[in-house]
């Protein structure tokens, strides 16, 4: 089988169409064309054509992988998954990954370090969440342990406290005790340990004093009483107290406030 002509593709000047015996047979990257010294008149066997096609698949996949990496650093698993989605064959993926590693495009330790630092600075995630994400990205346990150790206790507490303050601002209608529990629960879900979450919750709510809680309680009582005024006095009182307890106020605190402020649920005559 002889190459009878070679033409440059119109849409991609770095790819060439190869014609065998006057008929289009396959196309190759410019680098593959030069490597195999493809030219008009060259005779190729079927085995050699298959070899060239495989080499071109690797070259094409390598170009795609480099473009994929141009947007941000990736882990080896992310690149492998991407190439699979591009329908690359297994042999090509392995060879592409080896070439990328030789070119220093893949370094899972550097990726993990950069990813962890970025998450710490920009997302305020806890260490457990970052660990889980690194596992999903295919990092080894050894690498994960190494990079997570760089997330100091001081940095964790600082980030957890910042998160706690955000949570507190979104839930400023609850009693201090309930608010602290909400903060602890949310911080644990964000990847912090329960011990650190408790410290951060205490730190974030440290400036809330008795006067602040009394003001919150007053507003909640007024709001709840308006909502329940259509009920009989005894039922309205019960519903109001229940609602306030659900927001974290203790029964004794509610009763004391009602008594001290002479708040009655009896109908006015």
UniProtKB/Swiss-Prot annotation:
Keyword Nucleotide-binding attached: no
Function in brief: Modulates RecA activity.
InterPro entries to which the protein is assigned, alphabetical: RecX_HTH_1st, RecX_HTH_2nd, RecX_HTH_3rd, Regulatory_RecX, WH-like_DNA-bd_sf
Family: Belongs to the RecX family.
UniProt-listed Pfam families: RecX_HTH1 (PF21982), RecX_HTH2 (PF02631), RecX_HTH3 (PF21981)
GO biological processes: regulation of DNA repair
Keywords for the protein's UniProt record, in alphabetical order: Cytoplasm
Gene Ontology CC entries for this record: cytoplasm
Keyword Metal-binding in annotation: no
UniProt-recorded name of the protein: Regulatory protein RecX
Protein location: Cytoplasm
Broad class of where this protein is predominantly found: cytoplasm
Lineage, highest ranks first: Bacteria, Bacillati, Bacillota, Bacilli, Bacillales
UniProt source species: Listeria monocytogenes serotype 4b (strain CLIP80459)
